[in-house]
UniProtKB/Swiss-Prot annotation:
GO terms for cellular component: HslUV protease complex. ATP binds at I18, G60, V61, G62, K63, T64, E65, D256, E321, R393. The keyword Nuclease does not apply. InterPro entries: AAA+_ATPase, ATP-dep_Clp_protease_ClpX, ATPase_AAA_core, Clp_ATPase_C, HslU, P-loop_NTPase. ATPase subunit of a proteasome-like degradation complex; this subunit has chaperone activity. The binding of ATP and its subsequent hydrolysis by HslU are essential for unfolding of protein substrates subsequently hydrolyzed by HslV. HslU recognizes the N-terminal part of its protein substrates and unfolds these before they are guided to HslV for hydrolysis. The lineage of its organism: Bacteria, Pseudomonadati, Pseudomonadota, Gammaproteobacteria, Enterobacterales. This is ATP-dependent protease ATPase subunit HslU. The gene is hslU. One of its GO terms (molecular function) is proteasome-activating activity. Keywords: ATP-binding, Chaperone, Cytoplasm, Nucleotide-binding. GO terms for biological process: protein unfolding; proteolysis involved in protein catabolic process. It is found in: Cytoplasm.
């Protein structure tokens, strides 16, 4: 679990997301409260439940990006799902319980990687010795015992040095490794993924594990042997137990596009992919027990963060019970020209930095001037206002059009520096932004 304080979390999010201070503060406090809760005694800890969050704001303002970055910051099981992928229990499609199953799978993977990294040095030593056993020749029979030992020690040291330096990477050797029986591919009908996964595991385990001899390059042999030896040092039952505990105590679920499952006023009949999904989400958010292939998982203390644009609906269109279980509501603001300008230059790995790096691979150097950046931001904002506001995503469309000629002729401009100033932007974008037919900019 991350031990970062709210200001530290906000500072990290600031590196990638411009503005939206309220949303950043809300998620940073929620993340810190996960750590605070774990410091309490067991009785009080059980009573403290997470305060779930609903993020409201137009498309392209950073809701999904906050989730992506939060996943990296939170050293906890995390999963992002689209609300539109689910249908009500009893109908064809994914059931909401699969959210918890997927979260548990993510936790298993996370804990497994942690355990592998913990044993990394030991595994590397074992693999190195196995490779050396194959590489080092047996001493001649007519040698004395001391000659054998001395020669063997020198040879091992020589090969060990070459192995560590990567000199022998391309050399082929024959090794014995575990081979698993080929699994049977099963086409899963919607909503039956859990059953098909169990059937595939069953078929894979029927043949057991056998050793087989394979001739491989040393670099490939190291990869396979590392996986094999790492698996031997891992206790699967302990990993399952630890993963389920991590999910129950620190799990975070981000539900995107929740506005798309609001019931429409003019609809009639059973609403299996809208209100039905909301009803199925209720027990998960409130707290229930879900059966997974790794064991039973309680959802009482899992943090749920939902987000939606709510362009054709409002949060009050959600069923009242679900509204009550998302007590913290944060509104994200539409982006301005100044925000666009910052998005183009300030974040780590900004869009302009990405284009510059891509062109440098062909020996073309791009220089964006301050005036040029401002003009790009104004062009994107103008198109958003004229057609449909899709937020920061519009910058990708505008920049792609702006860089089209440079990208196409990059090989002919090797060694040149191209300055993208206000004149260049006006020449390539003004005609398009002033044109009434802006359909080409709609994503």
């Amino acid at each position: 679990m991350s031990e970062m304080t709210p200001p530290q979390i906000v500072s990290e999010l600031d590196k990638f997301i411009i503005g939206q201070e309220k949303a950043k503060r809300a998620v940073s406090i929620a993340l810190r409260n996960r750590w605070r809760r774990m410091q309490l005694n067991s009785e009080l800890r059980y009573e403290v439940t997470p305060k779930n969050i609903l993020m409201i704001g137009p498309t392209g303002v950073g809701k999904t990006e906050i989730a992506r970055r939060l996943a990296k910051l939170a050293d906890s099981p995390f999963i992002k799902v689209e609300a539109t992928k689910f249908t009500e229990v009893g109908y064809v499609g994914k059931e909401v319980d699969s959210i918890i199953r997927d979260l548990t799978d993510a936790a298993i993977k996370m804990i497994r990687i942690k355990n592998i990294n913990k044993n990394k040095v030991r595994v590397e030593e074992i693999v190195e010795e196995k490779i050396l056993d194959v590489l080092v020749p047996t001493p001649k029979k007519n040698w004395t015992e001391s000659e054998k030992n001395e020669s063997l020690a020198k040879t091992i040291q020589t090969f060990r040095k070459k192995l560590r330096e990567g000199v022998l990477d391309e050399k082929e050797i024959e090794i014995n490794i575990l081979s698993t029986t080929m699994g049977v591919e099963i086409m899963a009908p919607p909503g039956m993924e859990e059953l098909t996964n169990q059937l595939q595991s069953l078929f894979q385990n029927l043949g057991g594990h056998k050793k087989s001899s394979r001739r491989l390059k040393i670099k490939d042999a190291i990869v396979l042997l590392t996986e094999e030896e790492a698996a031997k040092l891992i206790n699967q039952e302990e990993i399952k137990k630890e993963a389920i505990n991590a999910v129950e105590q620190n799990g975070i679920v981000f539900i995107d596009e929740i506005d798309k499952i609001c019931r429409r006023g003019d609809s009639s009949g059973p609403d299996i992919s809208r209100e039905g999904v909301q009803r199925d989400l209720l027990p998960l958010v409130e707290g229930c027990t879900v059966s997974t292939k790794h064991g039973m998982v309680k959802t009482d203390h899992i943090l749920f963060i939902a987000s939606g644009a709510f362009q054709t609906s409002t949060p009050s269109d959600l069923i009242p019970e679900l509204q009550g279980r998302l007590p913290i509501k944060v509104e994200l603001q539409a982006l301005t020209i100044d925000d666009f300008e910052k998005i183009l230059t300030e974040p780590t790995a900004s869009i302009t930095a990405q284009y510059k790096a891509l062109m440098e691979t062909e020996g073309v150097y791009i220089n964006f001037t301050k005036e040029g950046i401002r003009n790009i931001a104004e062009a994107a904002w103008k198109v958003n206002e004229s057609i449909e506001n899709i937020g920061a995503r519009r910058l990708h469309t505008v920049l792609e059009k702006l860089m089209e000629d440079i990208s196409f002729n990059a090989s002919d401009n090797k060694g040149n520096t191209i300055e993208i100033n206000s004149n260049y932007v006006e020449e390539h974008l003004d005609q398009l932004t002033s044109n009434e037919d802006l359909g080409r900019f709609i994503l």
